[in-house]
């Protein structure tokens, strides 16, 4: 609408990917967890971080502070590249309830080999979760240590804006929620 009148859109309102979080939850510590860490390292080229269980769940055999998952945060061009691979696996289709009210979205894939990683019988096959955090220029004001600020209500990202950005950038299809 603004471009029809010859005006440029405000560059501070432009949406971009702040970070991409990749998560593999194995549910147990040991060999399977270290193999899942190798998968994330192959995919991102970064060293992943182990996550601990918050509390004991006896029915699942999980103890508090036991390492049960592995995750990695990717930023910049590498994040866009990995997200592109993940969306290609999902055929650029997301549900409406994949998007949060704060303008972020997430989805999962069932097999990591769909991302182009060669199958290794010693590692096996793992599914993983993608979570994309969107931002605008100026969002870093909440992250700094000294003189932190709040993001104004007009500058925040809504669910509809995130869905529109996904449709425009990736020619994505948004299916109705369950």
Curated annotation (Swiss-Prot):
It is found in: Nucleus, Nucleolus; Cytoplasm. This is Large ribosomal subunit protein uL5. GO terms for cellular component: cytoplasm; nucleolus; nucleoplasm; ribonucleoprotein complex; ribosome. Component of the large ribosomal subunit (LSU). Part of the 5S RNP complex, which is a LSU subcomplex composed of the 5S RNA, RPL5 and RPL11. Component of a hexameric 5S RNP precursor complex, composed of 5S RNA, RRS1, RPF2/BXDC1, RPL5, RPL11 and HEATR3; this complex acts as a precursor for ribosome assembly. Interacts with PML. Interacts with MDM2 (via its RanBP2-type zinc finger domain); negatively regulates MDM2-mediated TP53 ubiquitination and degradation. Interacts with NOP53; retains RPL11 into the nucleolus. It comes from Pongo abelii (Sumatran orangutan). It holds the Pfam family Ribosomal_L5. The modification N6-acetyllysine is found at residues 52, 85. There is a cross-link at residues 38, 52, 154 (Glycyl lysine isopeptide (Lys-Gly) (interchain with G-Cter in SUMO2)).
